[in-house]
A protein has these predicted regions:
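AMP-binding/adenylate-forming catalytic core of the ANL superfamily
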Residues: 222, 324-440, 444, 462
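AMP-binding/adenylate-forming
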Residues: 141-157, 166-230
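General small-molecule cofactor/ligand-binding pocket signal
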Residues: 196-199, 203, 273-274, 447-452
Length: 474
């Protein structure tokens, strides 16, 4: 066995023996927290742990990964510059363009994989490639084990996924594959639940069969996008039955506040609706029930920092910027100071949450979307999620819409919006524009609505395509 593989397996054993990855599962059903020892660590212990793990992953990447060694040397960075976890901002930011260059020059996976571990990859996830060459994330035994641990923490603690519960995962496997059977369903099994993987086929093409499954299996916890949650609830109401879901897990994009309210209307048995943010690469943050919009980050797994996307410099506390992430336990393919592209506020709450006593930091407000989704109408900075909240106030609509963005600075907000009305008169159109304008701080004349029939909004898999990008590439 090579020294690299020996070190990798030793770290894996350490993580299990120290209890960061729970190995005795499922727990007793009366345990409230999946991993109380880790989830309630003292702040000083978390900070010390992050410093140790950041130093370790940086040294590992320097010693074993050709890509990082070359890239960091070209930027004047060396591992001994890291003295504390807060020094993460000294590490050069890595963006997808750099990965794509490496992939193109060194197919199939580039030089960012540790060569010995690359031969032992358990699973490969890929981005859609919608903005260029797809990028990949390789998962070995350690990475899979830890990510399943992270999933189990929120599924057990927040969603009540325990023995006897039935969980249905309706995330499009082609777009969210690392959140499908390789990880999420296996996390379900750790919790002792029954898992139904529904993401291997399109809901729309097998709708009647899926609706029958929901009724027959009495699904307790249902995971899909906010828009599909709503569509399924609306259709069940029209068919004269109530969905059985008690917990709604909202993936694939933050749910607007008013969308959440609509979900409780169409799913009358639902007790919780929880925003779950994550990426194919293995990042995650989950909304704590009772703490609206506050998504907790497992700090033993990653470090976040926030920068000005124009300068790459850290933004001040309370300012907004681009989310940068460092995975602390991904050794097969490290992602260190990697740009996730989400636009967030640099404000985190570190006091224990009042319900569970979880000490890991949480975002002070929801993640509204990606940096490239930002657009401006008459100088007003907007995201699709802001438009969605406004659309939900318009009567006789399905809540399904597409924002058409034709420039970064626009004179008009153009929206394709589904209406249940057979005909749209000028008065209805005027009232809709007034409602949306009032919500967004615009004038009604600044808004153009293209009215479409239910089912005509553009979707990509299980996700509503809220952002139709028609900007010319420069």
């Amino acid at each position: 066995m090579s020294s690299v593989l020996q070190e990798y397996e030793a770290i894996h054993r350490e993580l299990r023996s120290e209890g960061f990855i729970r190995s005795d599962y499922p727990p007793s059903s009366d345990e409230v927290l999946w991993n109380k020892k880790v989830m309630t660590m003292k702040r000083e212990e978390l900070d010390k742990l992050k410093t140790f793990r950041l130093k370790r992953i940086v040294k590992w990447a320097w010693d074993h990964i050709e890509f990082y060694r070359k890239y960091w040397k070209s930027k004047g960075f060396e591992p001994d510059m890291i003295k504390d976890w807060k020094d993460v901002v000294k590490i050069p930011i890595l963006r997808k363009d750099e990965l794509r260059k490496d992939l193109s020059a060194n197919p199939p996976f580039g030089t960012i994989f540790e060569p010995e571990l690359a031969r032992r990859i358990r699973f490969v996830g890929a981005t859609s490639g919608s903005t260029g060459l797809p990028t990949f994330q390789g998962w070995g035994a350690l990475e899979m084990d830890y990510f399943q641990e992270g999933q189990a923490r929120y599924l057990w603690t927040f969603a009540g996924v325990k023995p006897g519960r039935v969980y249905a995962n309706y995330l499009n496997m082609s777009g969210f594959y690392s959140w499908g059977p390789p990880v999420v369903e296996t996390a379900m099994w750790r919790c002792g639940a029954t898992a139904i993987a529904g993401g291997g086929e399109t809901f729309f093409s097998w709708k009647n069969r899926h609706m029958l499954i929901f009724k027959l299996w009495k699904v307790d916890v249902f995971a899909t996008t906010p828009w599909l949650h709503r569509l399924i609830g609306e259709e069940a109401k029209e068919q004269g039955w109530e969905t059985p879901f008690k917990v709604l897990l909202l993936h694939g994009g933050a749910a607007a506040e008013k969308t959440k309210k609509k979900l409780f209307e169409v799913h009358p048995n639902a007790e919780l609706a929880i925003n779950v943010w994550g990426t194919t690469d293995g990042h995650m943050a989950i909304e704590i029930p009772g703490q609206e919009g506050q998504l907790v980050v497992w700090e033993d797994m990653e470090i976040f920092d926030i920068v000005d996307p124009k300068t790459d410099e850290p933004v001040a506390e309370g300012e907004r910027g681009e989310l940068i992430a460092t995975l602390l336990n991904h050794f097969t393919m490290p992602l260190i100071r990697y740009s996730l592209g989400d636009y967030v506020k640099n404000e985190f709450i570190t006091d224990p949450d009042p319900k569970f006593g979880i000490t890991h930091m949480r975002f002070a407000e929801p993640i509204p979307g990606r940096v490239e989704w930002m657009f401006s109408v008459k100088g007003k900075l907007l995201f699709p999620i802001y438009v969605e909240d406004a659309v939900n106030d318009v009567p006789d609509t399905t809540g399904m819409y597409n924002v058409i963005v034709y420039d970064n600075e626009m004179d008009k907000l153009k929206i394709r919006m589904e209406t249940k009305r057979a005909t749209v008169d000028s008065e209805y159109d005027k009232r809709a524009r007034e409602i949306i304008a009032s919500n967004l701080g615009l004038n009604p004349d600044d808004i153009d609505i293209e009215w479409i029939r239910p089912g005509q909004a553009v979707w990509t898999g299980y996700k509503l395509q809220v952002f139709l990008d028609q900007r010319k590439k420069k």
